[in-house]
């Protein structure tokens, strides 16, 4: 995914395309395509770079559970985050960038250990919270040019992914307790 982000930004910058117009446009039927495309599009190289490092680091943390897991988390976060942004963000705006996915990854890593009752995953979540906690909180504060809606719903998508992808052990324990 990161390679695609960089190739698209290079094309946007050098060829002069207007790929950024394919972001999420709230409550516009044409804007629904942005649910799938917006994480790959960035305003400039600075925007892309600020998303690349946490995307790769947290993505690798999720990928420790396998390729299917990281792809599943990514799909859930993109869907929940994109739909939430499309429904709630102000009209006549365009939302682009991978930060919603980054917030989803962080929320997933924070919640996964609790859901699965796994010590290693709990430790990983605590590390994410310690390193990125203030960034996560500040990203939810409404500011000009920042899609706090994308951050919020990306985070919600991460929580949904943690519950939806809970390990069988956790699910079987829950069933036994019921």
Model-derived features: positions:
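A detector for small-residue-rich transmembrane helices and their helix-helix packing motifs
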Residues: 1-178
């Amino acid at each position: 995914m990161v390679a695609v982000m960089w190739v698209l930004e290079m094309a946007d910058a050098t060829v002069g395309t207007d790929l950024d117009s394919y972001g999420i446009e709230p409550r516009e039927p044409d804007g629904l395509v942005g649910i799938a495309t917006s994480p790959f599009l960035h305003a400039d190289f600075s925007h892309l770079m600020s998303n690349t490092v946490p995307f790769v680091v947290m993505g690798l943390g999720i990928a420790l559970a396998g390729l299917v897991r990281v792809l599943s988390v990514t799909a859930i976060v993109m869907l929940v985050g994109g739909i939430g942004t499309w429904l709630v963000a102000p009209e006549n705006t365009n939302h682009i960038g991978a930060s919603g996915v980054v917030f989803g990854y962080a929320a997933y890593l924070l919640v996964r250990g609790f859901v699965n009752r796994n010590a290693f995953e709990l430790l990983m979540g605590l590390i994410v919270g310690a390193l990125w906690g203030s960034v996560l909180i500040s990203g939810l504060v409404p500011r000009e040019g920042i899609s706090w809606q994308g951050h919020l719903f990306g985070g919600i998508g991460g929580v949904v992914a943690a519950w939806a992808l809970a390990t069988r052990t956790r699910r079987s324990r829950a069933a036994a307790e019921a």
